[in-house]
Amino acid sequence: DLIDAAKHKSKREIEEMEARIRRVPFLDEIDLRYRNRVAVPQPVARAVMFCLMDVSASMDEDKKDLAKRFFTLLYLFLTRKYGEVDLIFIRHTDDAEEVDEDAFFNDTRSGGTVVYSALELADKIRAERYARGWNVYAAQASDGDAFGADPARSARFLRERLLPATRYYTYLELAAPDTQDHSSTLWAEYERVAEASGNCAMRHATRRDEIYPVFRDLFR
């Protein structure tokens, strides 16, 4: 499966990923398990990573494959190096649900698209479980196929609720390779938020061979 395949990525790619670990913008020294150099006990700072994935009907199998590859890299990246990082998996159609790792990567689900539902659930979980003493990070993958009031409402919620409580937020928008205009209304709304913030980054991807470079660019 995808996780097993990712585990067998070339040694060069894995070594490069690990070499960049200490330059990753969203995990600085306070997120790392303290390495005692002076024999004085120090607290272990805690970090949580929210993984949000669109699994609606507009996300065809190719797009879902791209999203799963992105999150598999993220999963391996964090679990290989940071045992103290909690991972929260949220998938959404027109409603959102928290699921385990296996369901997130493997279960099939489809429906309409309400991006806001995933952001709202992420914030609810953050407030209930990770309100104090946690460094919060999030990564979202979607084709941006949201309509009506959802893009603007989602961007407003991101700006007003999630970003103030988040150290680093990334958005990956997926499109078919032959798509001429890769940017959705959701992208346009998010872009305005990202430009005004210092902790939000956005990228596009259309092919499998773009996922690793995009991931590396986001987390270098």
Segment roles from a protein language model:
Residues 103-136:
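Von Willebrand factor
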Residues 1-50, 59-61, 83:
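Acidic, polar low-complexity linker/tail segments
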Residues 26-28, 63-67, 111-119, 150, ...:
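Phosphate/oxyanion-binding active-site loops and adjacent basic polyanion-contact surfaces
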Residues 96-101:
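Short acidic/His/Gly/Ser-rich catalytic and metal-binding motifs that mark active-site loops
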Residues 40-42, 80-81, 127-133, 160:
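Surface-exposed acidic, glycine-flexible loop patches that form ligand/cofactor-binding
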Residues 51-56, 135-150, 174:
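DG-centered beta-turn motif at the end of beta-strands
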Residues 46-47, 57-89:
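…and closely analogous acidic/polar surface helices at protein-protein or active-site interfaces
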Residues 157-220:
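Von Willebrand factor type A / integrin I
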